[in-house]
Structures are given as C-alpha cells and as structure tokens.
A protein has these predicted regions:
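Carbohydrate-active catalytic/glycan-binding domains of CAZyme proteins
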Residues: 1-171
C-alpha cells in the first residue's frame, strides 16, 4: 500500500463500454458508450424504451446519448451528461456508440457510430460532431454519416481517429 488515494473500480457509476481516454490540456477525459440502465430511474428512459425503430436489439433504443467524464487527478471524476444526443444528429435514430475524439484547429471533433446498420439498404454509419469545448455540447458536423456503407464486409462502426507523426489526422 503506497498510501495514495485511488479512484477505485469502477471509476464512476454507470454501465459504460467502449471508453476513449484522452488528455486535453491538464485534464484527463473519458468518452464512453452508454450501454444499459444501471441504478438509474427507468422513468427518464421511458420514451426511449417505447420508441419504435428497426433496431435489431431493443436495448439499442436506450443508446440515445453520450456522457463524458473529466478529472485533473485520475481520482475525482466529473460527469458531463449528454455531451451528444441523437436530437443533435438527425440521421441517428438509435445506437449512438463507440466515441473517438480529437482536438484540431480550436475545435473538438467527436466521431461515433450510429444506427448499427447490417446492410447497405439501411441508413447509418460513422458520424462526426463538433464542439468548441471538450464537454460539449456536440452537434452533427455533416448532416449525414461520414462513412455510410459496409466496405469489405465491415460495418461502419468502432472507428478510431488519431493524429499521425506527420501531423495528419487519420480514421
């Protein structure tokens, strides 16, 4: 025992997946996918549960937003709720997930998967939203998916964006 305070496990309450960890300035940030209800009042999700979509899994109807978490010390975390919501991305109806974020040219770009398409007859794919701050709010940047087709048999989901050694951003 080092006597140092730790954040514990889990580091914040909730049921999250696909975390993207990044440092902006002197703050650590985590952008995860909201997976399932976990100790929250189901009443706040009632409308999402009752929505009719073509989701292959009804629980995808709950994935209507993304939260973010920030910390200066990796011990104490602040929740930034609903940094991105499907209301701000008109082409997404369900399954907003797998965030990846970069900072470029004074803006923050949050890439995400939307609608879990299973074939090219469905509409969805990889989107990008933009904000002036890492805590959002993020708004759809294109009005359509950046990548909307299944390519080489791969769904357009689970993207990762980074800045390469040459300074170029890659997806």
């Amino acid at each position: 025992n080092t006597g140092k305070k730790t954040s514990g496990n889990p580091i914040f309450p909730g049921w999250y997946a696909d975390p993207e960890g990044i440092v902006f300035g002197d703050e650590y940030w985590i952008y995860p996918t909201l997976s399932l209800l976990y100790g929250e009042d189901e009443e706040i999700y009632k409308a999402d549960l009752e929505r009719q979509t073509d989701a292959i899994n009804p629980e995808y109807n709950l994935q209507t937003h993304m939260d973010a978490f920030s910390s200066k010390d990796l011990v104490n975390w602040t929740k930034h709720p609903r940094v991105l919501h499907i209301e701000d991305v008109p082409w997404v109806k369900y399954a907003l997930w797998a965030p990846s974020i970069i900072q470029a040219n004074g803006k923050y770009y949050l890439f995400f998967g939307g609608n879990d398409i299973q074939n090219n007859d469905q509409y969805g794919g990889i989107g990008v939203a933009v904000s002036d701050k890492p805590e959002g709010p993020f708004k759809d940047a294109l009005g359509k998916p950046l990548i909307s087709q299944i390519i080489n048999g791969a769904q357009p989901i689970d993207q990762f964006v980074y800045r390469d050694d040459d300074g170029e951003h890659r997806l």
